[in-house]
């Protein structure tokens, strides 16, 4: 079994760019940014429980990273960058820390490296279980209306929230809930030590208005790019800023 993905081919000899979306997104999420790099072959992946991979269920991060590896092999992708937002960034960091032959580097946008205390994990597990129950039992429009009121999305205006609620409400609530629990921060290892000892290139993108993830970025041994005029979802709020950072990283 492999993950559903959309492949776009560029010039031979350059590494692939493998894009991983955030929670409740899909393979289209990164395409405005990715299509600015047409010289590179691009793979836009649907993570389990999402988009064309909605029917794929997993029990944890190891299942997700295993599926990602199989997917890359199936496309004969032997030289690549992982580019991930939020959940996709966490998957990218996990996969890279476990080891991926052919990995050039990881570019993470607003991805959490992991909680550091049992108390934080317990709090997060309770919170994610409550959200998962809502995703399973309530209309998605109602759930996402509340979801986008969370502090991490404080930089969004009312129109941006309405647009995201409408877009995300096309998902399957049950499969989102399952993926939320399987990849909760409560069950993710703290990756800080692994990332400090890494052998791959590591870049971190965060929005100028995203104080939480700017603080997290400062804890990581990563080259950090702060994207102006953006909050947590920088590639949506300022795609041109993210394109500029990726171009600098890739020396495009």
Swiss-Prot record:
It catalyses: 5-enolpyruvoyl-6-hydroxy-2-succinyl-cyclohex-3-ene-1-carboxylate = (1R,6R)-6-hydroxy-2-succinyl-cyclohexa-2,4-diene-1-carboxylate + pyruvate. Pfam families: Abhydrolase_6. The keyword Lyase applies. GO terms for molecular function: 2-succinyl-6-hydroxy-2,4-cyclohexadiene-1-carboxylate synthase activity. Keywords: Lyase, Menaquinone biosynthesis. Pathway: Quinol/quinone metabolism; 1,4-dihydroxy-2-naphthoate biosynthesis; 1,4-dihydroxy-2-naphthoate from chorismate: step 3/7; Quinol/quinone metabolism; menaquinone biosynthesis. It is an enzyme of class 4 (lyase). The keyword Lyase applies. It comes from the Bacteria. GO terms for biological process: menaquinone biosynthetic process. InterPro entries: AB_hydrolase_1, AB_hydrolase_fold, SHCHC_synthase_MenH. Its EC number is 4.2.99.20. Belongs to the AB hydrolase superfamily. MenH family. Monomer. Catalyzes a proton abstraction reaction that results in 2,5-elimination of pyruvate from 2-succinyl-5-enolpyruvyl-6-hydroxy-3-cyclohexene-1-carboxylate (SEPHCHC) and the formation of 2-succinyl-6-hydroxy-2,4-cyclohexadiene-1-carboxylate (SHCHC). This is 2-succinyl-6-hydroxy-2,4-cyclohexadiene-1-carboxylate synthase. The gene is menH.
């Amino acid at each position: 079994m492999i993950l559903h993905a959309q492949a776009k081919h560029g010039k031979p000899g350059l590494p692939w760019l493998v894009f991983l979306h955030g929670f409740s997104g899909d393979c289209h999420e990164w395409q405005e940014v990715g299509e600015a790099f047409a010289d590179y072959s691009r793979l836009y992946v649907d993570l389990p429980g999402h988009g064309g991979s909605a029917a794929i269920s997993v029990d944890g991060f190891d299942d997700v990273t295993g599926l990602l590896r199989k997917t890359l092999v199936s496309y004969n992708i032997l030289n690549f960058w992982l580019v991930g937002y939020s959940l996709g960034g966490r998957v990218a960091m996990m996969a890279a820390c476990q080891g991926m032959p052919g990995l050039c580097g990881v570019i993470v946008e607003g991805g959490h490296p992991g909680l550091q205390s049992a108390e934080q994990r317990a709090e997060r597990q309770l919170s994610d279980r409550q959200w998962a129950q809502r995703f399973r039992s309530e209309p998605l429009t109602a759930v996402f209306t509340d979801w986008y009121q969370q502090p991490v999305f404080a930089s969004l205006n009312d129109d941006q929230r309405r647009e995201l609620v409408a877009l995300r409400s096309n998902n399957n609530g049950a499969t989102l809930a399952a993926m939320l629990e399987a990849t909760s921060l409560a069950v993710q290892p703290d990756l800080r030590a692994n990332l400090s000892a890494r052998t791959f290139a590591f870049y971190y993108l965060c929005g100028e208005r995203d104080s939480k993830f700017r603080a997290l970025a400062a804890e990581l041994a990563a080259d950090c790019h702060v994207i102006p005029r953006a909050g947590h979802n920088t590639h949506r709020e300022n795609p041109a800023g993210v394109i500029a950072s990726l171009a600098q990283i890739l020396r495009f």
